[in-house]
Design a protein with these regions (language model features):
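Conserved active-site alpha-helix within GNAT-family acetyltransferase domains
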Residues: 98, 114, 122-140
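Conserved beta-strand-loop-alpha-helix junction that forms the acyl-donor binding cleft
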Residues: 118-127, 145-150
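A short beta-loop-alpha structural element at the N-terminal edge
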Residues: 5-19
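A short helix-loop-beta-strand connector motif used in the catalytic cores of GNAT acetyltransferases and
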Residues: 43-55, 81
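Conserved acetyl-CoA-binding loop-helix of GNAT-fold acetyltransferases
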Residues: 87, 93-106, 129-133
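Conserved GNAT acetyl-CoA-binding A-motif
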Residues: 101, 108-119
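Conserved GNAT-fold acetyl-CoA-binding loop/helix
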Residues: 19-43
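Conserved beta-strand in the GNAT
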Residues: 55, 60-69, 81, 86
Length: 159
C-alpha cells in the first residue's frame, strides 16, 4: 500500500472528491451532493485566494479536506475554518487524516490564522477522538445547524 501524500486538489479530482463527499453525507444523514455541484463548488474554491481543497493520494484519492481563512469579528482575528475532512472508510486509522490536518495547520499558520475551527457531530465519537488526539479541544459551545432554502425561505408564521 502506497504511503499517502497530500497535495492541493485540481479540477481533475472532482470525481474522487464527489465520492468522498457522498460518503461523508451518508454518514451524517445528509443528502449527498450531485457530481455537478461538487465540480462547480470545487472550481469556485480553487479560484478563492484564501481557500484550499486538499487531497490525500495513496492508490488513488483516499481523503480530502477543505479550508478557508477568513476574518472573524467574533474572535477579532483570522480564523481557519475546516468545513470538510473525510477519509475513505477502508483507509481510516492509517494516518491519512493526520496528514491532511498537518497541511491544514501549515496553511492556517502561513496565512496568519490564530485559530482553527472545525465541527464533528456529537454522535461521531471516532471523529471527536481523532481531533482530540491532534490536540484540538472540544468547547462548551453547543451548535445547532439551521437551514433554510434561499429561493423559498421558511415562513416564520408557519409551524
Amino acid at each position: 500500500m502506497d504511503e499517502p501524500r497530500v497535495r492541493e486538489a485540481t479540477e481533475r479530482d472532482a470525481e474522487a472528491i464527489h465520492a468522498l463527499a457522498v460518503e461523508l453525507a451518508v454518514a451524517l444523514g445528509d443528502s449527498p451532493p450531485t457530481p455537478d455541484n461538487v465540480r462547480a463548488r470545487l472550481a469556485e474554491l480553487l479560484e478563492e485566494p484564501r481557500a484550499w481543497v486538499l487531497v490525500a493520494e495513496g492508490e488513488g484519492v483516499v481523503g480530502a479536506a477543505s479550508l478557508w481563512v477568513k476574518p472573524d469579528l467574533a474572535h477579532g482575528d483570522a480564523v481557519a475554518e475546516v468545513p470538510m475532512l473525510v477519509v475513505r472508510e477502508e483507509r481510516r486509522r492509517e494516518g491519512v487524516g493526520k496528514l491532511l490536518m498537518e497541511e491544514v495547520q501549515r496553511l492556517a499558520a502561513e496565512n496568519d490564522a490564530n485559530l482553527i475551527e472545525l465541527v464533528a457531530a456529537t454522535q461521531n465519537a471516532q471523529a471527536r477522538e481523532f481531533y482530540r488526539s491532534l490536540g484540538f479541544v472540544e468547547t462548551d459551545h453547543v451548535a445547532l445547524e439551521f437551514v433554510g432554502d434561499v429561493d423559498d425561505p421558511p415562513d416564520p408564521d408557519e409551524d
